[in-house]
Amino acid sequence: MATLKHINSKNADYGAAEQYLLFEHDEFTMKPVLDETGRLIPREDYRLSTLNCGGEDFAVACMRANLRYEKNQRREDVKSHHYIISFDPRDGPDNGLTVDRAQELGEKFCAEHFPGHQALICTHPDGHNHSGNIHVHIVINSLRIEEVPFLPYMDRPADTKAGCKHRCTDAACLLYTSPSPRDPKTSRMPSSA
């Protein structure tokens, strides 16, 4: 079964998230790893897609939306939310999970749970400890750009409106990881099976 981790960020540089996902980083210091000439080292294997960016770069699309709605302008504002879905290392050999399938699952999870948000979805085949766990990073702009239907974890009407901010509530995290009403043995987390 997959696990979910949430990190919110006040960093106004949306490009930093993409840089982290595309280039090697020291997993302990979080600093980029450089080659002998001082250049960033691209990650060897990843899948990357965006959602609701209108064909623009994720960072540019987020900055345009923030300006349009006059949000995320203050230093203390949470600018983005980073969700990491980590699959069990056994999901590869036992259930046939591949990086491509994990990317599909991440895109579906993002579309279902973060509708109306600009998103960057990136899948890596392994972590820094070489445990073999495929993991999906989902980075969303905290600002919703489209009105969406009221979802079970939302507790205010404003949570559905374009121009309003995403809130990672306890109810949302419980919903994401709770058993599915369709099948109590499974969670709403993406399943590799």
Language model region names:
Residues Y176-A193:
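Single conserved hydrophobic/aromatic residue that forms the stacking wall/gate
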Residues M1-S178:
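N-terminal nicking endonuclease/strand-transfer module with a His-rich metal-binding environment
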